[in-house]
Regions:
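CheY-like receiver
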Residues: 2, 129-153
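Two-component/phosphorelay signaling modules centered on CheY-like receiver
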Residues: 17-36
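Acidic, metal-coordinating helix/loop segments flanking the phosphotransfer/catalytic sites
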Residues: 37-55
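Receiver (REC) domain active-site loop signature in two-component systems and cognate sites
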Residues: 62
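C-terminal output helix
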Residues: 113-123, 134
Length: 153
């Protein structure tokens, strides 16, 4: 069961400081989210492992570690593999979107986007993630109870 007092944490990674603050402020005002920001991919990776967010919103084009590389790093780590990743990018070509999904994105959104639309997508991917987490826990409990039952006798 999810703790009703838990405020989901969203990590927003974008090298455009003005846009980063606008997104963070919109998420704080429109939804019950705790928001953490990072201004490049390397800092995003570092912040991810500091706060273990419930969702990560990622720009693609950033200096150094870009959004695709950040997603691949997160998907390659067992602790972050199931965290929802949402790309927020101005790159609108189908090949860009395909590259995003192949890198591990759960959603690919185009800039500019309205704040309410962004909140809706984040809420949806966090909800999906919670459902999947509960399913995994139930399956594990089922396996454990079968093991306990098999040892008796």
């Amino acid at each position: 069961m999810t703790d009703p007092s838990h405020r989901p944490t969203v990590l927003v990674v974008d090298d455009n400081e003005d846009l980063l603050e606008l997104i963070a402020e919109s998420l704080r005002k429109l939804a019950p989210y705790s928001v953490v920001t990072a201004s490049d991919g390397a800092q995003g990776l570092e912040r991810y492992f500091e706060v273990h967010p419930d969702c990560v919103v990622i720009d693609v084009k950033m200096p150094g570690l870009d959004g695709y590389q950040l997603m691949k790093a997160l998907r390659g780590d067992a602790n972050s593999r199931s965290t929802p990743l949402v790309i927020l990018s101005a790159m609108a070509q189908p090949k860009d979107q395909l590259a995003g999904f192949l890198s591990g994105a759960d959603e690919y959104l185009l800039k500019p986007i309205g704040p309410l639309e962004l909140v809706k997508v984040i809420a949806t991917v966090i909800g999906r993630s919670e459902v999947e987490r509960c399913r995994r826990q139930q399956a594990l409990l089922g396996e454990l109870s079968q093991q306990d039952g098999g040892d008796e006798g």
